[in-house]
Amino acid sequence: MLTVNAKDFGLIPNVEELQHGAIQKAIDHCFAQGGGDVVIPKGVYHLGDIRLRSHITLRLESGVHLMGSRNPEDYFNHRGDKVEPIAPERITDAPYVGLWTIHGETEYEENKPEYRFRRLPASRWNNAIIRAIDAEDIKVIGERDSVIDGVNCFDPQGEEDYRGPHGMTFYNCKNVELKGYTIQQTGNWAHWLLFCENITMTDVQTLAGHDGADFFSCRNVAVENCVFHTGDDCIAGFGNINVHISGCLLNSSCSAMRFSATNALIEHCRMVGPGQYCFRGSMSKEEKAAGAPSALIGHRNNMLSAFTYYADFSMPIPALPGNILIADCEFENADRFLHYNFSGNETWQRYRPLDSIEFRNIKATNVAMPINAYGAEEVPLSLVLRNIDMSVKEEMADKNLIHACHYRSIVVDGLKVRGKVKNLICKWSDGYISLRGLEGVPDTVVTDNKPFFAQGI
C-alpha cells in the first residue's frame, strides 16, 4: 500500500495559512494510484474542508492539531472538486429549516424541499472539516494526542443562526474506520454519517461542541471504548440497522443517547451527568459569535435523559425500530431514565414508532422524572425492565415512576428503588403488565383519564 507524507505535497506546520490544499493533493495522489495512507506529521495546521476518497487512510501522528478555519466560507472546497465532481443535482443552497416549523407530516416524503439541506451531500449544513461522499474503505486513524479542532466555528447562516460545519460528514460510504484521535469544539456535530454501511469507531474522544456521533439510515455500526463529553447528545440518530455500542463513557448536557435502531445492543456503558461542557444553545449570541469555550457558569449542563427515542421525518427509516437492548450500564444524574413520547407533541418522535426495548442490569442514580413509555396505537410498545437498581430524587415523591400508554406489554422483573415514588405505573390505556421482584417501590398501577402530556426534549 502506498504511503505518502503530506509535507511532500506542500504541507507546512505552525503557520496561519490554510493547509487543506496540500492535504488534498496528497489524498488525490494516493487516490490516483488506487489508494494509500496519507500521513500528517506533528504540527498545528489550519484548514478548511478536505475530502477523503475511496481506499484512503488519513493518519494523524502524535502531536497533530488540525484546526478548522473560523470562517464558514472556507468549507466549500468540495464544490470545485475536479477529481470526483459532484453532480449539480446533489448541490443545494437550501437553508437549514427548523424541524419544529414543519407541521402536518404523516408519512416520509423523499423529495420534500424542507429537508434538502440535510439529504443532499453538498449543502451548507453538511459542510465539515473532513468529508467523504460515495467512498469505500476509508479511515481516519489518530495516534495518541492527535486532535481535530473545530474551534467552535460560528456561522450566522447555520443551524439556529450560529452552528458552523461538522467535524466529519460521511455520505453514502462503506467500510468506515475511525480510531484513536480526539475531536473537539466542532461547529456542529462531531461525526455525521448518513446512508453509510460497516462503520467502526474505536478509542475516539469527543469533547465539547454539540452532538458526538450521529448515525442516520446506517447499517452495521460499532462504537467501542469511546469517550464523549458533549454539550449536546453524545450518540444520536435513527433509521439504523444492527448497532453495537460498548464500553463507552457518555457525558452530556442533553441526552446520553437520542437514538433508535432496529437490532441494537448498548452494553457496559456509563451515562453520566451533569455535562462537563454546557449546551451551547444556552450561551449568548455574543459568546457564540466569538467562538467562546463551552463554559459551565451561567449555562445549562444537566443531563436531560439517559435514553431518548428519536424518529422524525427528515431521513428514511427502512425498518420498524425495535429489538433494542441496553444492558450492564450505569446511569448517573440523568433527569430521565427513558423518554419515549409518541403522543404527538414531540418534534423528534413522530415518524415510525418503537416496537420494543429492554433495560437489563442497570444501576441508575438520582432519577428526577418519570419513565415515559408512550407508544403508538398501531404499534404498541413492549418494555422490559429487568434487574434495575434505581435511586430517585425527592421531587419524585409525588410522581409515578412509569407513565405508560399504547403498550403491548410492560414486564418488570427485579426493580429496587431507593427513595419515594407515588405509584409504580400510571397508565392511559390497557395492556399486559407483569410485576416481579419489587423492592422499595409500591406495586400500585393506576389509571389516569386526563390527557397525557410530557414535555418534549
Where on the chain are the PLM-derived regions?
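Extracellular/periplasmic carbohydrate-active domains that bind, remodel
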Residues: 1-457
